[in-house]
Amino acid sequence: MPTLLTIFGIRFFFYSREHEPIHVHVEHADGKAKFILGEDAVELVECKGLKTSTLKLAESILEENRIDFIAQWKATFNG
């Protein structure tokens, strides 16, 4: 379960046996979420228990790191 980044108590990761579309799981003490990382955007597809403020922060961090996270996904699964 490779961790891509942990910041502000939020962990961004994917599982070692993932499937497309490219996506990242997010965990925080509040709950969890899953985002698809597209070529141009980040899309929330699942959220359980995260506060709105935590969710918005996670989405912002994903937008800033989207290209790097996509590259790490591709290196892991297409590598």
Stretches with model-predicted labels:
Residues 50-79:
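C-terminal structural segments of small proteins and small subunits
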Residues 10-12, 33, 67, 75:
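Short non-domain terminal segments
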Residues 15-50:
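A short, structured beta-strand/loop element
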